[in-house]
């Protein structure tokens, strides 16, 4: 009896230990529903638990070796444990537990598909990892880096497409008449080089700013600016400008050298007059102030009827009008010639410089007179005129007689 009592006490201790161990594995709702009928059946789950622990350790080893399959298995096991904890009745219908397991497996499968959505195939992900030079430090870090890389590639592709569209638009806007288009040979377009980091910007070589070359910037839809082309204006040949300026200078110089005597006479009248005109070669009828009678006098002297007076070397004096009270005429002085000092007596001489650059001496004071200037010599004084240029010059004079 003593042996039986000791055996029964030892078996009861063992059963209590197994019940305590199983109570920690099951939810709290199952602790109150235990009975002595289940005492003999609790020794087997202890061994199964060891096997499950061994299986979980093996799953961890597989997870270290192969990330894809191990992660899926671990996720499925975790989902199954959560489903068991949520179900308080372990003796429930087997059909509901099967449905829950299938739903958990579907959720795990969907989550795994969403997590690996960025890289479609493992071979592509491995190639991308090798090209980026990344090592496996964890599934989340690797997927995050892959996602950033793929999004950056998409943005770069969009930017390249925008740049290409802008370049195509710039090509279409330029007319065919221009010799150089916006797509200049100085543009450096981005090139794709695998395994080498390159910029995706459109660059340009140094421009000839002195010729007016400028960069044509265009705005992107996403913001910022891109190079749309190079503007190169048409150049005008400098030879034409030089010829045109030279011709203008020559014509103005020739106009200045024209003498008034050789200037052509215009036979066209600006206004048609309907009145009778007198003959310039015939004398004109005028009234004598002393006798109050009408007399004939020569008042007009055409240029072909000038009276020649003096000619000394290149000095010429023409008298155009000669009356008892005054006389008028024209004085022509040759290049670098001098008229000479002369006394006017009791008369008065009035001069007008029609064309020239002269040195005029009035009594004892020299002056420089040019075209358009006038001067006169009073009675009883001397005067002298010298041409300072190497060209013929003309003066008009009037002599007032005393």
Curated annotation (Swiss-Prot):
Segments of this protein annotated with the region MIF2 homology domain II: 196-218
Compositionally biased tracts (Low complexity): 1-12
Keyword Cell division appears in the UniProt entry: yes
Keywords, alphabetical: Cell cycle, Cell division, Centromere, Chromosome, DNA-binding, Isopeptide bond, Kinetochore, Mitosis, Nucleus, Phosphoprotein, Ubl conjugation
Source species, domain of life: Eukaryota
Span list, region MIF2 homology domain III: 349-402
GO cellular component labels: kinetochore; nucleus; pericentric heterochromatin
Comp. bias intervals (Polar residues): 88-118
InterPro entries in the cross-refs: CENP-C/Mif2/cnp3 (IPR028386), Mif2/CENP-C_cupin (IPR025974), RmlC-like_jellyroll (IPR014710), RmlC_Cupin_sf (IPR011051)
Keyword Ubl conjugation belongs to the record: yes
Basic residues: bias regions: 44-53
Residue ranges, annotated region (Disordered): 1-118
Cellular localisation: Nucleus; Chromosome, Centromere, Kinetochore; Chromosome, Centromere
Cross-link (Glycyl lysine isopeptide (Lys-Gly) (interchain with G-Cter in SUMO2)): 1, 186, 266
GO biological process: attachment of mitotic spindle microtubules to kinetochore; cell division; chromosome segregation; kinetochore assembly; mitotic cell cycle; spindle attachment to meiosis I kinetochore
Main location: nucleus
GO molecular-function term, one example from the UniProt record: centromeric DNA binding
Chain positions found as Phosphoserine: 5, 222, 232
SUPFAM superfamilies from the UniProt entry: RmlC-like cupins
Subunit structure: Oligomer. Component of the CENPA-NAC complex, at least composed of CENPA, CENPC, CENPH, CENPM, CENPN, CENPT and CENPU. The CENPA-NAC complex interacts with the CENPA-CAD complex, composed of CENPI, CENPK, CENPL, CENPO, CENPP, CENPQ, CENPR and CENPS. Binds to DAXX. Interacts with DNMT3B. Interacts directly with CENPA. Identified in a centromere complex containing histones H2A, H2B and H4, and at least CENPA, CENPB, CENPC, CENPT, CENPN, HJURP, SUPT16H, SSRP1 and RSF1. Interacts with MEIKIN.
Function: Component of the CENPA-NAC (nucleosome-associated) complex, a complex that plays a central role in assembly of kinetochore proteins, mitotic progression and chromosome segregation. The CENPA-NAC complex recruits the CENPA-CAD (nucleosome distal) complex and may be involved in incorporation of newly synthesized CENPA into centromeres. CENPC recruits DNA methylation and DNMT3B to both centromeric and pericentromeric satellite repeats and regulates the histone code in these regions.
Protein's UniProt name: Centromere protein C
Encoding gene per record: CENPC
